[in-house]
Amino acid sequence: MKFLTILIASYLSWSLTCSAIPQNFGGNLFGATFEPRTINDDFTENLIAASAWINNKLPGTWKSIPSLDEDEVKILNVNPIIFGQHSSSVYANEEKGKLKSISILYLDSGKFFNRRTISNKSQDIKSLKREFKKTYDLIESTINKTLYKYTKSSPKESFVGQTDFLRNNYNDYEFGDLTLRVSAKNGHNICLIIMRSADVSKTYLSSKTSKLIKRERRKELQQNVQMQENGDIKINGIPMFRQGQRPYCAISTLGMATHYLGLRLGADALAAGARFRYINTAKGSKMLDLYRAAAEESDAILQRGRSFDFERAQKYLEKGFPIVVWRRYSHERNLLHNAAAQGTKLPESTPNDRITWPTAKDAPGHASVITGFNKKTGEVIFMESWGEHARNKRMRAEELEATSYATFYFKI
């Protein structure tokens, strides 16, 4: 694949322009956190040298990490100085053994605020914001000045994305056959992406998807639908975006559904688009605008309903189109849905059972991706943004219809 889901800087939106950054920094997607140690060596020359881009000879030791695409993603085991500033994380993205991009994260708002809060719990949010802005301004200024010295030219303004809501603007410096792309979003992150100029794109769609006409895309999605002997009809190939401890269920599930459709914007990039300022709250976010924009960037049609409609949903799922549902959540019901994924029969939809459904408006909200159904048993099959163990959960359609309050149907 031409590039991997990225994010950085405002948890950057990506494009083949910003490739190689895994979905969630700090291990939220991949499990255990890997923290490279900081060193004072300068790796700048090594990362832009011909030996790296022609012979695939990268400096230092790199650790392979899982990726959502077919690319190989590696993280550098140290944080050196690059273009005048210490890095926070450095990633390399390779396709079939060929280096495609190097992404350097300098500053991440989530990591910054988490670390400061842990080390100094008495520090108030206003002083933290002032400290972050000061750090942000220093890093941005240093990087741009150093890049100007290297390239001996001013940057060109560029962008990726078709919608005002998710479009990201960058400063591109040209250095031989390479583009050095600075992504700096005040209030979020700062990163630098190094790539071949020939790989620059203005769309978030994967290179493969962008080459297909809609009829071909629909055919590919249809081929992901599998019918099993027990009557289950399921969509295969929807990736897992783990939300970790953040209030990202609506964002992670959107990312899962749209990545499946060919969009290469991860949860963090979408969070930035939804105006998530910091990681501990979804307050003030513009979620409905985000869903509409993500669908448009996916070159897909989004139709929104209120309560889940089982009859309508079947028509979408049979064609390989995913559905995201916002619903009210109950821990007790969740245990039943988990058990059903392991083969335990769901309780019958009796009056006594219905009493336990979380239908109250003050019940916690949650988002799930509907991936299949069984018409014979009247069950829906769904997944959560909690990890691979949260796939193939089951719920009676009546329960989902009663507990849902927004449904998003995607189609090509």
Describe the predicted segments one by one.
Residues 142-149, 255-264, 293-297, 315-320, ...:
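Structured segments of extracytoplasmic/periplasmic soluble domains
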Residues 309-383:
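Active-site-adjacent substructure of cysteine-protease-like catalytic cores
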Residues 1-20:
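Classical Sec-dependent N-terminal signal peptides that target proteins to the secretory pathway
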Residues 184-186, 190-230, 348-362, 369-412:
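Noncatalytic regulatory segments and standalone regulatory/sensor domains
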Residues 154-155, 264-271, 301-312:
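Surface-exposed patches in mature extracellular/periplasmic domains of secreted proteins
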Residues 21, 70-161, 340-342:
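Long, charged/polar, surface-exposed segments that mediate recognition or autoinhibition
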Residues 18-64, 167-296, 361:
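Active-site-adjacent structural segments surrounding the nucleophilic cysteine of cysteine proteases
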